Amino acid sequence: MLGALLLSGAVHAAVQPLDSVVAIVDNDVIMKSQMDQRVREVQQTIAKRGSGVPPAADLQPQVLDRLILENLQLQMGERSGIRVSDDELNQAIGTIAQRNNMSVEQFRAALAHDGLSYEDAREQVRREMIISRVRQRRVAERIQVSEQEVKNFLASDQGKAQLSEEFHLANILIATPDSASSDAIQAAAVKAKSIYDQLKKGADFAKIAATTSSSENALEGGDMGWRKAAQLPPPFGDMLSSMPIGDVTPPARTPGGFIILKLLEKRGGQGQAQMRDEVHVRHILIKPSEIRSEEATKLLAQKIYERIENGEDFATLAKSFSEDPGSALNGGDLNWVDPNSLVPEFRDVMSSTPQGELSKPFKTAYGWHVLEVLGRRATDATGQARDQQALSVLRNRKYDEELQTWLRQIRDEAYVEIKLPGATQAAQ
């Protein structure tokens, strides 16, 4: 959504009247004006892609479900003390402007020219960043890929053939809950087959995705962006290399339901780097939580930094305080790392810290860090780069599946009461 901020007309200058509640979501509500505004945004996005624009009534259930999931994640972020500072927000806005080949001032002017509010745009970006950090903590951090999985993947025909090719895809997901009965699964299969038949006869993929798909990207016409084939569920791996652009795959059952893919574009892989800079670094991570505020977390990181500066042992303090389970027991040692594999905030601080010196406390999506650079080197990374690429596609594949499962879980566990006239009640 962020990358399409300008194109989609996603932020409106005029504040719409809050006329009625359409959903109660745990401790918050969603107003009809919010839903109506999002429906208009989706219609504008679909229209700019040249697809047929669905009626507002057809989009309302999908839009409301998206707003409910966003609301639940924002509430989680609030309870967990996740905040986005103005400096972080300014940096994100700068990145969005750069992606649109603009300066920030040009970006603001372009928004104003289109009758859009820069202040509303900032708040939309802030919400997206909070949701991203919630997902990082709740989903991405618990995904594990073993060395054996990487080796097996690289040795497989799928791994050898697919690491070098990328596909721009759109998808339609007909979801099946974990507890779905055999009749419900059969009904989903029939629905997916019916949609596939419509698509083969020339039906508008983006329009059908926006009105029927349960996928996270349904309201973007199902657009998934660029993916390695290996990142996708196994049934699709062998189909995509030989599939003509514009074609769709038959429905395939996955853990989340029945998926149909459309191939939008195809491109060859990037060349592998032969040499790579690596940094030997150790760090201490302190995370905010429901019982420790952002400010208290920052203060604790500052105190640890001062203790190290005053001569206390870094490794000992890391074992006592660090909340990074992968490095705490090793005294915070991350060993030799590729800077490009790290989140930008960590990478930038590490790059600017001289060898043998300590950084001041700094913040990333994971929490507050103190790091020490122990060494730098250039290494032949041909094999390591391929291992890292395999690790990345396996993690992304698991993340996509885990995210859908987690979103269903938080939706099922929440109290949600739908008050939209004519909608099915979904209170829990």
From Swiss-Prot:
Domain PpiC: 164-265, 276-375
GO cellular component: outer membrane-bounded periplasmic space
Root EC class: isomerase
InterPro entries in UniProt: OMP_Chaperone_SurA (IPR050280), PPIase_dom_sf (IPR046357), PPIase_PpiC (IPR000297), PPIase_SurA (IPR023034), SurA_N (IPR015391), Trigger_fact/SurA_dom_sf (IPR027304)
Keyword list, A-Z: Chaperone, Isomerase, Periplasm, Repeat, Rotamase, Signal
One Pfam family per UniProt: Rotamase_3
Catalytic activity: [protein]-peptidylproline (omega=180) = [protein]-peptidylproline (omega=0)
Keyword Isomerase set for record: yes
BP terms from Gene Ontology: Gram-negative-bacterium-type cell outer membrane assembly; protein folding; protein stabilization
Signal peptide annotation: 1-13
Intracellular or extracellular location(s): Periplasm
SUPFAM superfamilies in UniProt: FKBP-like (SSF54534), Triger factor/SurA peptide-binding domain-like (SSF109998)
GO terms for MF: peptide binding; peptidyl-prolyl cis-trans isomerase activity; unfolded protein binding
EC identifiers of the protein: 5.2.1.8
Cited PANTHER family: CHAPERONE SURA
Domain notes: The PPIase activity resides only in the second parvulin domain. The N-terminal region and the C-terminal tail are necessary and sufficient for the chaperone activity of SurA. The PPIase activity is dispensable for SurA to function as a chaperone. The N-terminal region and the C-terminal tail are also required for porin recognition.
Protein role: Chaperone involved in the correct folding and assembly of outer membrane proteins. Recognizes specific patterns of aromatic residues and the orientation of their side chains, which are found more frequently in integral outer membrane proteins. May act in both early periplasmic and late outer membrane-associated steps of protein maturation.
Protein known as: Chaperone SurA
